[in-house]
């Protein structure tokens, strides 16, 4: 089997070029200051004439801890600031936070003393704890905070966060909005914040210059936003394509790579699905083809569990995204699967015959499941695609009652995948937590091994197979076509002054 491991390592072409500059990692037992956020004329869009109009869902409310629409969540980021912002490269910058230090399972964040909150005292540690508790329980921010169990104010400008495990990259999770204590308790509340704008009478007014006004037009759903853009009522439309509905809108369209990872779950408790066969499956899957055909071009093929546009991906991974039939067959043959039994290859002990379950509510994913089944058939696999209701699909996964499943998960700003390797999560059933891809992950997050070393291990074992990252799209009117989207997918309006 050592020969198989060598083949996987060499032929997959994991050209791991590790950079000495690691912007996201915090040194152990240290406190690292975060640079002030700066905005230049070259990468910002200035509101000067009060004519910019953005969509607003009035029934959803502007409270960021209760809002569910993208329109209002993105609007709220102009009104409220996070501890750390996360840009399109998944690099973090301290906004309300001045610094962060990691010691064991504790992250200590120091708050800037001069974060002004209009009409209130400056933001302090108690406000951060209040905001964290609301974010942890919220629809949009809750999943981002997996791995952070609680927060406690140590003094007026220091917050201690308790972690599930030592995590030098945890700042990427801390992009939730900070508001003043007691101002965000209900859906109809308009919390007090420290952002560039404040909300009043269905419009946003610049804190620095009251003449800078952003008008808001009420919209009830995504279709109404798009209609409003097409007739010139609003200047921005965004869709994450979760409804699988792509329309051609009037304006300047920009495709945005989201943090939504499409992946193939593999049950390692099935005898045939050892790390070698899993690697053969990963080699044969053509991520580029799935992105282009199954997702109609609205995805980016990538075979590591890190965002393809992130700094980490640029430093670490060069993995072939096209299918490699020769490599897959080589691995399968060396595992003894050299003859057929019916329509599937066998090694005498196991048969390469599996079921692949998929949620029937997502037609992109259903198409991808059949694509994978057809592709693997070329190497002697017999894959029975089972299209299930969401309830049945979810129950099968959480109970570990599956061979393979095609899933999707939204990664947070730190690209944490610990949920796949921790007991008790719906993602971990069927994953062998004693294999190196699981155990080494926590050493990587603790800073004991480099990102280069960890993702090399992952690509040798593939506890699950990342397939692609979905994309959404933004349409900008002619009036704001120069708006910089450098903070997407986390902040649509980050480029507005």
Predicted regions mapped to residue ranges:
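N-terminal lobe/hinge region of extracytoplasmic solute-binding protein
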Residues: 54-102, 133
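Surface-exposed binding/hinge segments that line
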Residues: 101, 106, 141-184, 198, ...
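Extracytoplasmic/peripheral linker and loop segments enriched in polar/acidic and small residues
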Residues: 384-393, 418-480, 497
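Aromatic- and charge-enriched surface segment that lines or borders ligand/interaction sites
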Residues: 68, 98-140
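Append "and occasionally in soluble cytosolic enzymes with long acidic Gly/Pro-rich linkers
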Residues: 274-371
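Extracellular/periplasmic solute-recognition and catalytic clefts
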Residues: 201-203, 209, 215-269
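Gly/Pro-rich hinge or "lid" segments in bacterial periplasmic/extracellular proteins
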Residues: 162-223, 325-326, 330
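Periplasmic binding protein-like
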Residues: 54, 229, 377-424
């Amino acid at each position: 089997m050592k020969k198989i491991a060598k083949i996987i390592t060499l032929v997959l072409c994991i050209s791991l070029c590790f950079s000495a500059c690691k912007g996201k990692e915090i040194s152990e037992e240290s406190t690292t200051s975060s640079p002030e956020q700066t905005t230049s004329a070259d990468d910002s869009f200035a509101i000067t004439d009060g004519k910019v109009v953005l969509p607003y869902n009035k029934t959803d409310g502007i409270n960021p801890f209760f809002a569910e629409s993208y329109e209002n969540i993105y609007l709220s980021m102009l009104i409220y600031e996070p501890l750390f912002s996360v840009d399109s490269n998944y690099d973090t910058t301290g906004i309300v936070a001045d610094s962060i230090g990691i010691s064991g399972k504790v992250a200590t964040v120091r708050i800037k003393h001069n974060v002004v909150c209009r009409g209130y005292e400056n933001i302090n540690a108690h406000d951060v704890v209040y905001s964290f508790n609301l974010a942890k329980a919220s629809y949009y921010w809750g999943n981002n905070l997996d791995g952070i169990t609680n927060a406690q104010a140590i003094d007026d400008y220091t917050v201690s966060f308790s972690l599930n495990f030592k995590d030098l990259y945890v700042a990427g999770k801390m992009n939730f909005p900070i508001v003043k204590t007691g101002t965000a308790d209900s859906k109809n509340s308009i919390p007090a914040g420290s952002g560039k704008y404040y909300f009043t009478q269905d419009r946003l007014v610049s804190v620095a210059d009251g003449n800078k006004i952003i008008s808001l037009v009420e919209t009830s759903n995504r279709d109404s936003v798009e209609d409003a853009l097409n007739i010139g009522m609003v200047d921005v439309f965004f869709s994450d394509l979760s409804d699988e509905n792509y329309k051609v809108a009037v304006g300047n369209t920009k495709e945005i790579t989201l943090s939504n990872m499409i992946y193939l779950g593999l049950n390692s408790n099935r005898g045939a699905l050892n790390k070698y066969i899993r690697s053969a499956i990963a080699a044969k899957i053509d991520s580029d083809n799935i992105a282009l055909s199954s997702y109609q071009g609205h995805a980016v093929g990538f075979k590591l569990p890190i965002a393809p546009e992130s700094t980490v991906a640029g430093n670490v991974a060069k993995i072939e995204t096209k299918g490699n039939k020769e490599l897959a067959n080589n691995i399968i043959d060396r595992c003894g699967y050299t003859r057929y039994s019916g329509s599937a290859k066998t090694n005498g002990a196991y048969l390469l015959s599996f079921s692949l379950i998929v949620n029937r509510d997502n037609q992109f994913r259903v198409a991808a499941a059949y694509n994978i089944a057809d592709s693997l058939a070329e190497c002697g696999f017999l894959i029975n695609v089972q299209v299930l209701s969401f309830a049945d699909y979810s129950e099968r996964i959480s109970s570990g009652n599956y061979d393979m499943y095609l899933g999707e998960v939204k990664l947070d700003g730190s690209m944490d995948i610990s949920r796949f390797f921790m007991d008790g999560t719906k993602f971990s059933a069927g994953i062998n937590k004693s294999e190196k891809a699981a155990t080494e992950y926590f050493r990587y997050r603790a800073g004991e091994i480099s990102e280069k070393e960890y993702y090399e291990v992952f690509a040798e074992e593939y506890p699950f197979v990342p397939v692609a990252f979905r994309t959404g799209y933004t349409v900008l009117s002619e009036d704001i076509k120069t708006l910089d989207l450098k903070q997407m997918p986390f902040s649509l309006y980050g480029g507005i002054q």
